[in-house]
Amino acid sequence: LAYFMTTKQYIPYIRKIVGKEHYVDVKNVMIMGGGATAVRTVKTMPSYMDVKIIETDEQRCERLNALLEDEKALIINGDGRDLSLLVEEGIKNTQAFVALTGNAETNILACLTAKRMGVRKTVAMVENIDYVSMAESLDIGTIINKKSIAAKIGRAHV
């Protein structure tokens, strides 16, 4: 793991030397699921990113609007599994899709769908540890598992 600090003008050079020169800058992000993880994610994103959160629960959408009123996020009440909604909301112009619902299967399938629709970077939250290796084998992108992250942090502090 390596970290680089540079000015904006040298980013293409850094990408070239690490073999990531075709890496896509992420400007448009779509998040499926409006839970606490989504809120923390949006609050830590750079201000130049445009974020859309798709949430099925209307009351949760209202709460998200209140929690994220200072952030550059559009809250959409709908089902992130609805292909026509994804197209209508611009998934084809989205560089990153993040599935953060409480359902691992939904997150995995949503990321597979996003990949097939041309999204280059996908992230799926997979709470069921039994699904992690299967999800990794599907090449859906990044897998987040809170339990394994907590275990790694715990081992690092022992």
Predicted regions and their residues:
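Cytosolic regulatory regions of ion transport systems
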Residues: 1-158
